Amino acid sequence: MRRTRSALMVALLIATALAPLAARSTPRVAAQPALPEQVYLALGDSIAAGLVTSLPRVRGYPWLVRDLMEKHFTSEGAPAVTLINRAVPGETTTSFLAGDQLREARADIEAARARGAEVRAVTVTLGGNDILRLAGSDEAERQAGLDQFRTTFPAALAAIREALGEMPADIVVTTYYDLSEGNPAEQGSDAWWVAQFNEVIRQSAAAEGARVADVEPVFRGNIREWTWYPSDIHANNAGHAEIARLVWQALGYDQEPPTVTIERPAAGPLGRRTPTVRVRADDAVGVTRVELLVDGTYVQDLRYIPSQGAYLGVWDARDWSDASATLTVRATDLAGNQASAEVEVALPGS
């Protein structure tokens, strides 16, 4: 009987002790759901297919953009970013509207919707072959081709938007670089005709609420560096990296500036007039440039040294006449976001 009584007392004490805890307990808050699978759909021609890069499925611009999206969205809880690249080398706007690429894109969008995925981005690189097939044509033929493009390119964008339905995907179209690097203001020149087609692309994008990665002005002056021209018309690895950067900026997902810290020199008197400038600059997606400015004037780009994990340079102030200076370091990331840091220094022997 004593044992029974003791057991009852222990049970009563435990129940009494736990009662206040139960009274104070609150319902569990459900964990916020992660982002669904993010889908990136790449459409277009041989540029979008990554043709003539060293590794098309690694260095082609859609794969580079996918990698950037993955860095960005996985940090927000997305399980993955899936790239579906339907680009067809040789595709024109006319063949796009009538061929398999658009049909397959529609099926991809429906499949994503059915499995609960989100088509987050669509890139469209179309029109290059519409331009190329008119090479060597007379003015009347080129005008007829341009008039047709004014119908087919907007129709292609409208078909993509219709397929997306209520899915709020971001559409980015790319313009085309001018291999001649001529004067686009010179009516009738190759550069002028390329500019006319690019203007159709820009205007059509505006009408459909799409964004523009404006390749042409950025490639101007860099054709031999960023393409295989004159042996081939396609962009090389460096060119695709530049297109990817422009697309990433146009998408506008990354609004976070990099972090910048000046490690050397410290504020105050300098030990010599050729100080080493050492900077840490970090970004979740990537830093593209770190500049040194002195009293607001650009001096040089600092160079990243992997073994140091820092950006380094030397400021040559031997001819600097003022007793002091403000050193500003400005870092830019892939999305174009910028951040800066400053340090005030006094020069010796002033």
How would you describe each model-predicted region?
Residues 1-11:
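Bacterial N-terminal signal peptides that target proteins for export
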Residues 10-20:
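Bacterial N-terminal signal peptides
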Residues 29-87:
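Serine-esterase "nucleophile elbow" of acetyl-processing enzymes
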Residues 39-44, 48, 82-87, 120-125, ...:
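Structural recognition of the beta-strand scaffold that forms the well-ordered cores
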Residues 97-147:
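Oxyanion-hole/transition-state-stabilizing segment in secreted/luminal serine hydrolases
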Residues 125-129, 157-194:
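Active-site segments of SGNH/GDSL-like serine hydrolases
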Residues 176-255:
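Catalytic His-Asp segment of secreted/periplasmic serine-dependent ester chemistry enzymes
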Residues 257-349:
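Long, low-complexity serine/threonine/glycine- and acidic-rich segments characteristic of extracellular
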